[in-house]
Amino acid sequence: MNDKKHLGHQAKKRFGQNFLHNDAVISDIVDAINPEPGENLIEIGPGLGALTEPVIERAGKLSVVELDRDLAHRLRHHPFLAKDLTIYETDALKFDFSELATEEQPLRIFGNLPYNISTPLIFHLLTFKDKVKDMHFMLQKEVVERMAAGPHCKAYGRLSIMTQYQCQVFPVMEIGPEAFKPAPKVDSAIVRLIPHAHIENPVKDINALNTVCLAAFNQRRKTIRNTFKKLITEAQLAELNIDANLRPENLSLDEYKKLADFIVDNPPEAAPVKEKRRMAKNKMTEPANNNLNENSAPEVD
């Protein structure tokens, strides 16, 4: 028996395809999304339509973003769903979701995301947060834990800070491997993200916040003093009421915001060329992501 084949489609590892097939789990996920007629609903990675069909039954229409041309073809020729679908056959990592939003109809985005690109895809989607009402995603359980984590725990990192700065994070439910075909080697979870209507004390530059977090959690066992010694002095840290002896996982979101604003106000012009190049590279580079088909490894997020 081919465990990687479901409803006549061979799961493709390069797309991180693991298809939901448990009806009870599917029903619970759709209940959590709570789609209604007239809403601007977008599904990422509809696959074989496990969520697509019940969402259309409730909402009446749906836009989907699907990279796999075989699956996009199936949806275009689906005898019941095709007439209610708008299909974008493209890479969600490159898709401009703002094109689908209007002032009257902010986006409601959901999907069983490919776990091997989940982190960069979340960061990409957050760039459209002003156009989004909410998002519901199936992710690796460990990723949801990191998104929701607070200071003083191992799961806390860049993903926690950058997500919580921009959204409310609500873990919704956990799902075991047996709900999928082929079954992944990790547990999964649903998370609800609701962009903040107003960010209190916003940072001067969100890219600076991202850069500070990358620098900190790439060296999470170092103290803040040692991590940022080329960018800020211990006396300056004290002026910001930040304990230089703390490690990155012990700083709050507000303290990272202070560090980011300090870097903006005091650009590291005097930093060695090598250090400046490292920071520039960190700004643009995403760390390795989770792989649904393998046991996860520690990450800098």
UniProtKB/Swiss-Prot annotation:
Class of the enzyme per the UniProt entry, highest EC level: transferase
Polar residues: compositionally biased ranges:
287-301
Tell me what reaction this enzyme catalyses. adenosine(1518)/adenosine(1519) in 16S rRNA + 4 S-adenosyl-L-methionine = N(6)-dimethyladenosine(1518)/N(6)-dimethyladenosine(1519) in 16S rRNA + 4 S-adenosyl-L-homocysteine + 4 H(+)
Positions contributing to S-adenosyl-L-methionine binding: N18, L20, G45, E66, D91, N112
Which superkingdom is the protein from? Bacteria
Question: What are the GO cellular component annotations?
Answer: cytosol
Q: Which residues does UniProt assign to the signal peptide?
A: none
The UniProt entry, under InterPro entries, shows:
KsgA/Erm, rRNA_Ade_diMease-like_C, rRNA_Ade_Mease_Trfase_CS, rRNA_Ade_methylase_Trfase_N, rRNA_adenine_dimethylase, SAM-dependent_MTases_sf
- In this chain, the stretch annotated as Disordered covers 267-301
Swiss-Prot/TrEMBL keywords:
Cytoplasm, Methyltransferase, RNA-binding, rRNA processing, S-adenosyl-L-methionine, Transferase
Q: Give the enzyme's EC designation.
A: 2.1.1.182
The molecular function terms in GO held by this entry are: 16S rRNA (adenine(1518)-N(6)/adenine(1519)-N(6))-dimethyltransferase activity; RNA binding
Give the disulfide map. none
Gene3D superfamilies xref list: Ribosomal RNA adenine dimethylase-like, domain 2, Vaccinia Virus protein VP39
Its family remark reads:
Belongs to the class I-like SAM-binding methyltransferase superfamily. rRNA adenine N(6)-methyltransferase family. RsmA subfamily.
* Stored PANTHER family: DIMETHYLADENOSINE TRANSFERASE, DIMETHYLADENOSINE TRANSFERASE-RELATED
Q: What job does this protein perform? A: Specifically dimethylates two adjacent adenosines (A1518 and A1519) in the loop of a conserved hairpin near the 3'-end of 16S rRNA in the 30S particle. May play a critical role in biogenesis of 30S subunits.
Q: What is this protein called?
A: Ribosomal RNA small subunit methyltransferase A
State the organism's lineage: Bacteria, Pseudomonadati, Pseudomonadota, Gammaproteobacteria, Alteromonadales
Question: Its encoding gene is what?
Answer: rsmA
